[in-house]
Amino acid sequence: LCFDCKKYFQLLKPDYFYNNVKTEKAVLVGVHRKDDKENRLKDYLDELEALTTTAGAKTMARLTQNLEYPDPRTFIGEGKLNELETLVKVHEADLVIFDDELSPSQIRNIERVIKEVKILDRSMLILDIFSKNAKTAQAKTQVELAQNQYMLPRLTKMWTHLSKQKGGIGMKGPGETEIETDRRVIRSNITKLKERLELIEKQNTVQRQNRSDKKRVALVGYTNVGKSTIMNLLSNADLLAENKLFATLDSTVRKVVLEDQRYEGVHVPILLSDTVGFIRKLPTLLIESFKSTLAEVVEADALLHVIDVSNSDFENQMMLVKQTLFEIGAKDKPTLLVFNKVDQYMAQHPDTVLTEFEKSWLSKEHAPVVFVSATEKINITGFKQKIVELLNK
């Protein structure tokens, strides 16, 4: 690679956005559209702050604006942009993170006003978190493919970023010839990564076929709802179960033997898989890249849709998961709705009668439901029996 091109590929390393020298400070930006509910923006920015924390930065301030449509030039209005500039200076921020995907021209226009800080959008932030959390060859390849595809149309803009980085990474951007050369390199890289993923998927398909004698059940749900904790509980495994967004990227499969409570001595062996969590505004490129991982969901005999019932936005999270299942071709799978963290929900709503709450969701969803707490081990026996009954339908 040419020298300038090597500098570009530093963008594909996990530590591009965040360094280990200090905790970087961030200002978050969100837009409230006319169709949004009153408290929706707060929930959205709470989630963005959680993503920011997961990535290793500290949120110093938030800036919001009510807009019918985002400004095509700078996403937020001119007055708000000046207000953002002031916030960045007051808090000595290193990052500005928008809760939407920005176009290359929007980032360039914002940079003309907000100088000497990194301007990130939601997609860039999520890609960086995925890059840090990828452990297997498959996950690393999937993330790198998504990064390359995301960066390709933004290459000119990213050279602007590089020219601003402290530490002397490039004092000025390359000429048109260098950028075209680098575009060819990235396109070639995308082709190679796709070929590598196809090979990995062929190997995975063979492995799944070899496991075809057992029923396959996949855990699905929004990120950080407790899927890995439930996986550990059912399989007696020791997977990473952190209170962080996207702690699990790789699809992990464990053999689990359930006992049918209706008949003494009857056991039901299953293969249980834990999958990457979904999230609002998950970059389309990531969904495309992770389709091979999500094959565990598409080919499963049944799904356990895990929901954090203690989250005030859990109904919208449920809808997003259902939409994603529709997009990957898994919406008609037999599904058990697993309302997790019921202990926290009951602490928040002490007057709730749990049996009535369960009945209301049963009538709403026309699907089996169960209320559990994986951490407190509440109603686990009933949960296991619901899985058995789901598979016997």
What are the language-model segments listed below?
Residues 28-32, 62-65, 97-99, 304-308, ...:
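Conserved beta-strand segments of the P-loop GTPase G domain that flank and frequently precede/overlap
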Residues 20-23, 161-287, 294, 298:
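Conserved G1/Walker A P-loop phosphate-binding module
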Residues 44-53, 85-90, 100-117, 259-268, ...:
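Conserved C-terminal guanine-recognition region of P-loop GTPase G domains, centered on the G4
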Residues 115-167, 331-336, 343-393:
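Canonical P-loop GTPase G-domain recognition
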Residues 32-36, 67-69, 101-104, 124-127, ...:
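Conserved nucleotide-binding/hydrolysis micro-motifs of P-loop NTPases
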Residues 35-40, 70-74, 133-137, 178, ...:
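Flexible beta-alpha connector loops of hexameric P-loop NTPases
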Residues 1-126:
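N-terminal accessory targeting/assembly segments
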Residues 48, 96, 148, 186, ...:
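Residue-level signature of catalytic and energy-coupling elements of molecular machines
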